[in-house]
Amino acid sequence: MVRFMYALRKRRLSLLLAMSLLVMCVASVVSPPPQALASGSGGIERVFTDKARYNPGDAVSIRVQAKNGTGSSWSGAARLEIFHLENSVYTSSQSLSLTNGQSTTLTFTWTAPSTDFRGYFVRIDAGTLGQGATAIDVSSDFTKYPRYGYISEFESGETALESKAKVDQLAQDYHINAWQFYDWMWRHDKMIKRTGGSIDSTWLDLFNREISWSTLQNQIDAVHDVNGKAMAYAMIYASRENYSPLGISPTWGIYEDSSHTNQFDVDFGDGSTYLYMSDPQNPNWQNYIHAEYIDSINTAGFDGIHVDQMGQRSNVYDYNGNSIDLSTRFSPFLDQAKSVLSANNPARDNLTYNIVDGTVNGWAVNDVSKNADLDFLYSEIWYLSDSYNQLKNYIEQLRANGGNKAVVLAAYMNYADNAGTRYEAESASMTNVSTNTNHAGYTGSGFVDQFASTGDKVSFAINAPEAGDYSLVFRYGNNTGANSTLNLYVDGNFVQKLYFFNQSSWGTWKHDAWYQVPLTQGAHTVELRYESGNVGAVNLDSLTLGTFDEHSVRLADAMMSASGATHIELGDDNQMLPHEYYPNRSKTMRSSLKNAMKDHYNFITAYENLLFDSDVVPNDTGSQFVNLTGVSASGDGSANTVWYINKRTSDYNIVHLINLLGNDNQWRNTASQPSFQTNLPAKIYIGADETISDVYLASPDLSGGETQELAFTSGTDAGGKYVSFTVPELKYWNMIYMKRTFSVPANDIYEAETAIKSNVSTNTNHAGYTGSGFVDGFSSTNDGVSFVVKSTASDDYALRFRYANGGSDATRDVYVDGKLAGTVSFKSTGSWSTWSYGEITARLEPGHHTIVLWQTSGNTGAINLDHLDLDKTYIWQFDRQIVSVPAGYRITFRTGLPGWVHWGVNGWTGVTDTPLRSNGSLDGNLDHETSIGPFATGTAVDVTFLWDDNNNGILEPSTDRWEGTDFGINVS
């Protein structure tokens, strides 16, 4: 993780922040809370597996913890059933007899199938005793479906059994299969501390936290015991202060000036602690730090490296004064790191890298996600992708750039919110202090003033609704010019000295003074006392029991998973991550959220193939595809709507429904419980060549995640072909998946009259059309035709729209899977019975795609649309002059000028002039295109260009400018 958000934007960190993090390190040492029950009901208290992930053919142990609380003896059977999606693949049953109050654990064993990379849902049904569920991931490589957690505490005194317990809890309850070991190292530039060649038993990290080597080893062993992977946190360019004795040279550094006076650094404000930055592309730095990576793997037993950075830096110079673009220097470093790690041990060469402040086309995003040799993509989200839809679009860009590599997001929930039950200081019991209202921004009716002398005290009477960890968060003001301290007592016992940091004014309120404590259920007393040794003064506004908001977490996790990403959020001691500094525990989960997370992680594990596989294609989310009766719906995550996300795989159509009713469009902030829906009518429009055989619903919120089959009807109306069904219940997130077959039309010609139609009609009153007719009335804003097509290969495709235009020239925008591909020109054909083609080229991966031809407010004219012809093509450009194409492919020419492709075959026979049309590209060198072909094997295509410099659209061979060079393309 980026060490602190502030470090992204500033060179120096204040002493205030550095000290606050030191306090947090101390404060986070607490006993673990009682374990949350896994997905189960009634007497089935917990269902779990013994591993986080299984290799094909492994023995899978499924354990069921049951307790009879019925009030009398119970006898019956516990039935196990395992599903892959909607299909049952295994059943087993065990007899069970329990007296009232008796507990037992059943163990079922199943052999994982030989098919790699599949998720399975596990159901336990014990009739009147209860039901339960878990999930199984059969994958030989965790990077296909990384469910990433973290460990951040490595203190002495933690036994091997305690290390195993904290890892087992995350593996069993949440299927976490990889752990980021955060800030485990001694120094960022010398990770393992040695004395006289021997590894020290303990060392202190950057913030003086104790790191125990034996604890670290025990935790790594525990991760391996559950078939998980341990990833060592490291920086891409950071060295601590006094780095020269380690052999690191300032000549490797990056600087703020061309005279190498100021090396980029992070100053922690205590006058002695710094992180200095080296050039990631400097080979000497690479050799040095990559050796540290290898030492971490070979000596500590890590399985890979999690590489971090500090975010955007501009105006960067190397030691020699050369200006460098830092954003382009990460990929070469990472490629070399991967090569070095693989050469050292290919079984322990996993590598990922933090793309900081991720957003569509953000800093370093495209270079790293497209080019770096990473096993999965990882990105920390700050404030450039605040809305649900922005983050969805970013996830889709990462997956597209990375060839569908897995994506993990570090997205800190409720980050700026002081969420949880609040107790106002002015309503607490006070000793020797007063209340006031003379500084704006307080909550409640005022705040406690004059908290500045020995004997001053504020005592809160609080209620813990359940046993567990509680984060005590104090909101305060301090403008004394220095940091202040108070002592914290819980139930009369001294707990910790807390720091309250100096702010710019008394009207600046902060809630960064916190401490986490274990509490029993019921009443407790929390006191702040000013005692001997305390300093300064504070205004105290409130105490909050810092708590994650369940509604926002469930909605955000639904959005990320439905968009194709997982979320690093769960860590040691069953904690959730509130902050970029992982030991921060200023918020906690209550049991209801823990149970919801168990259901969520069961769900994303069981249905990983429909959520994260490479054949899951994001489709267009326009309103023409989904019709929900009785609620506001949107395809872009608009506030107060049911948000639908459409996808397709090779076998299924998928519609995710995320319930934002009653909430805004921001994922990070606290939310309200959405308005739950029952019996929601849905009509889903599909392609003319698709046939739906079954409709299923699965949700982490319903029946423990088990699939249920829905009754449906099929039909056709003015909008096109559809299936309709009733959604029985929608809480936070439903996934509708529909079993589908697809019949590719002859010659890949998709007829417009049978496609999905928006505000247009069909007709047959002009001859020359193909199929049964054509689309008419395509002439107004928000008119459109939407096709569902199948591509068989990763290739460029010419999207050729056959049309007639008896009026003025027209344009239409083309969207491929919801992303603007360009603008097609539909020149006048002179008659409504004269048909021609307008076209644009797009890259398609194998799978099922939506192609939408739409009239936006920026488009003009009217057309009749006959069909879409989907043809594979090779692209010729002046900066990429291809000389051969396969038989059966078209050739697309992209240029920066209007004119004609003047071409013939086999020595200029059959000469033809094909016009180049504007495609709407923002690249002035590629904003015109056309295609020719396809051609048979052995054909030699001869090509040159005639440029329409006067832009009158009239072919004038004696007037227009010839290119003057002939180009040849062979067909093989």
Curated annotation (Swiss-Prot):
Top enzyme category: transferase
GO MF entries: carbohydrate binding; glycosyltransferase activity
Gene3D superfamilies attached to this UniProt entry: Galactose-binding domain-like, Glycosidases, Golgi alpha-mannosidase II, Immunoglobulins
Self-association and partners: Monomer.
pH-activity relationship: Optimum pH is 5.5.
Record's protein name: Cycloisomaltooligosaccharide glucanotransferase
Entry EC no(s): 2.4.1.248
Species: Niallia circulans (Bacillus circulans)
Functional description taken from the UniProt entry: Produces cycloisomaltooligosaccharide from dextran containing 7, 8 or 9 glucose units. The enzyme is specific for (1->6)-alpha-D-glucans (dextrans) and, without activity toward (1->4)-alpha-D-glucans, such as amylose. It also has no activity on oligosaccharides, such as amylopectin and pullulan, containing (1->6)-alpha-D-glucosidic linkages at branch points.
PROSITE patterns: CBM6
Keywords: Glycosyltransferase, Repeat, Signal, Transferase
Pfam family, one: CBM_35
Protein family membership: Belongs to the glycosyl hydrolase 66 family.
Leader peptide range in chain numbering: 1-38
CBM6 domain mapped to chain residues: 421-546, 748-871
